[in-house]
A protein has these predicted regions:
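Conserved redox-active cysteine motifs that mediate thiol-disulfide chemistry
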Residues: 45-60
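Thioredoxin-like thiol-disulfide oxidoreductase module
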Residues: 28-31, 63-66, 70-152
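A conditional alpha-helix N-cap/helix-loop micro-motif detector
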Residues: 20-24, 91
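Hydrophobic beta-strand anchors of alpha/beta hydrolase catalytic cores
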Residues: 41-43, 50, 75, 111
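Bacterial Sec-dependent N-terminal signal peptides
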Residues: 1-21
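Intrinsically disordered, low-complexity boundary segments flanking structured domains
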Residues: 11, 59-65
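A short beta-strand-turn-helix
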Residues: 23-41
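C-terminal partner/receptor-binding element of secreted or periplasmic proteins
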Residues: 147-174
Length: 174
């Protein structure tokens, strides 16, 4: 009986510890790491069903791309908008963060960049005529990729050659 009780207690403890972290906890961890490493934070909202989210992750994690992003950013993900059977994957509070940054109106992936203190730098809503416009998400068209490069130039130490490599790679997303 004690053995079964021990197993039950262990399972409850494991289940409690395995809960999806809150959006606040994810962002605090990323900011602490960015502060320690002298980087900015790149936050991407995604979901398990989102093909464009997977495409963006794949592009950013390719062997030629990953070092360019990782030397400049702590990249973190917040899961939102999951289907009914996968709501457990969502980070509690991530929907509120998405809305706070205006990403709740344009689909995912939605991303934004902050400095290590959480000060906003830029997001995935392109600027048209001096105003925020639609979400470029995973950049693929010439205009979307140009905007992505603008954000990277503004928020990183990437040089022109590195930015050209990133541009060429993301244009392959079409």
């Amino acid at each position: 009986m004690k053995f079964l009780l021990s197993i039950g207690l262990a399972l409850v403890t494991f289940t409690l510890n395995a809960q999806t972290p809150t959006a606040a906890a994810v962002l605090e961890k990323a900011q602490a790491e960015a502060k320690a490493d002298g980087k900015n934070v790149f936050v991407m909202f995604h979901a398990s069903w989102c093909g464009w989210c997977h495409k963006m992750d794949k592009a950013m994690n390719e062997p030629d791309m990953k070092p360019l992003f990782e030397k400049n950013y702590v990249i973190t993900h917040l899961t939102v908008l999951e289907s009914e059977g996968k709501k457990n994957l969502e980070n509690p509070g991530a929907d509120k963060v998405l809305a706070q940054y205006g990403g709740d109106k344009g689909g995912i992936p939605f991303w934004y960049v902050t400095d290590a203190d959480g000060k906003f730098i830029e997001d995935s809503r392109a600027i048209v005529d001096g105003k925020k416009a639609g979400n470029v998400g995973c950049p693929a068209t010439e205009k979307e990729v140009d905007y992505f490069i603008y954000v990277l130039r503004k928020s990183s130490g990437l040089n022109d050659s590195e930015l050209a490599e990133i541009k060429a790679r993301f244009l392959k997303n079409q």
